[in-house]
Regions:
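Extended redox/cofactor-interaction regions of prokaryotic respiratory oxidoreductases
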Residues: 1-55, 59-60, 85, 148, ...
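Active-site phosphate/pyrophosphate-binding segments
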Residues: 115-116, 121-247
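Active-site-proximal structural scaffolding
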Residues: 18-19, 39, 50, 68, ...
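Hydrophobic alpha-helical scaffolding
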Residues: 9-15, 32, 36, 76-81, ...
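Long, well-ordered, tryptophan-enriched scaffold segments
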Residues: 56-58, 63-167
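Generic structural "secondary-structure junction" signal
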Residues: 6, 10, 21, 78-80, ...
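A short hydrophobic/aromatic micro-motif that marks alpha-helical segments and, especially, helix-coil
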Residues: 12, 94-95, 168, 214
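Short helix-capping/linker segments at secondary-structure and domain boundaries
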Residues: 94-102, 182, 198-205, 279
């Protein structure tokens, strides 16, 4: 969720009910039937919308989930933490088979190719060069390359890319599982590149690649008081703050409000969150 504003400026995406206008639904690590209060009504809206559109649904997730549960047209199991590599392999096919929405990329996007590369950016520092192996790492992100990382057969990656490139509107979304790892925010942003490449952003039946939007109920909350302590760290680094707090700095560890921590964490008050255990990117460490 925190990665989307760095791509779009907000977390917004199309609602589940808009799938009634879609031809294809692709879910990356998304399991609303189990993670949103046992579905929270989303599963019902999903089924109703698909019944109206007859959209094909592909679920990409390591284990078979309740969201799939016979509703999916295809389940593609993937090695955990490798969604970004899959996206790169798909992007390679989209680019090489001319399945990208070039007018959309030229008009609305920055940094896809040399035409929209910002002034001062390094040569071949654009997304297209990265995918084709013309960037700094020199590695072409071919389906064969992606297959070795993800465990998904090469021909299935190619087929998936063509399905995404040829089915418009396509509703591409993700859950929060893919980014529950080190540098996971980049995985979330990678998934968002698929609707960008294919011009499925901002249209009926499309999506931004974010988690599906749904109906909300306004609830009363306690007022938020001003915190006199201005120093803060990422919630994922609480383990480091216990083990080596005084060594953590702003430049290396993302400490905010101070150049470095003065003391390690000695007490944790955890409320309405589970970053202490199973929502952390390194549960072996927690």
């Amino acid at each position: 969720a925190c990665a989307m504003p760095y791509t779009y400026g907000s977390n917004d995406g199309n609602s589940t009910s808009d799938i009634e206008n879609s031809k294809l639904v692709v879910m990356f690590g998304n399991n609303p039937a189990e993670t949103r209060m046992s579905g929270g009504g989303i599963t019902w809206y999903l089924e109703q919308a698909r019944e109206r559109s007859n959209a094909r649904m592909i679920v990409i997730v390591p284990r078979y989930t309740d969201t799939a549960a016979g509703r999916e047209d295809e389940w593609i199991p993937i090695r955990p933490g490798t969604d970004a590599a899959l996206v790169a392999g798909i992007a390679w096919v989209l680019i090489n088979e001319d399945l990208v929405d070039q007018p959309f990329l030229d008009k609305y996007c920055v940094g896809y190719d040399e035409k929209t590369l910002p002034a001062g950016a390094p040569a071949n520092g654009h997304y297209k060069a990265y995918i084709l192996g013309e960037g700094d790492d020199g590695i072409a992100k071919t389906p064969q390359w992606a297959s070795r990382i993800t465990g998904i057969p090469t021909d299935r990656i190619i087929k998936l890319a063509r399905e995404i490139g040829m089915s418009k509107p396509a509703y591409i979304c993700q859950g929060w599982g893919p980014q529950r790892q080190a540098n996971g925010e980049l995985t979330a942003r990678a998934i968002a590149m698929l609707p960008i490449l294919t011009g499925n952003v901002g249209i009926n039946g499309g999506n931004s690649g974010a988690r599906e939007s749904t109906y909300t109920i306004t609830i009363e909350r306690l007022p938020v008081l001003e915190n006199p302590v201005k120093t803060a760290i990422s919630c994922f680094t609480w383990t480091d703050a216990i083990a080596r707090g005084p060594e953590m700095t702003a430049s290396r560890d993302g400490v905010r409000g101070k150049e470095k921590l003065d003391v390690p964490i000695k007490f944790i008050w955890n409320y309405a969150g589970n970053t202490i255990t199973n929502q952390h990117s390194d549960i072996n460490k927690t």
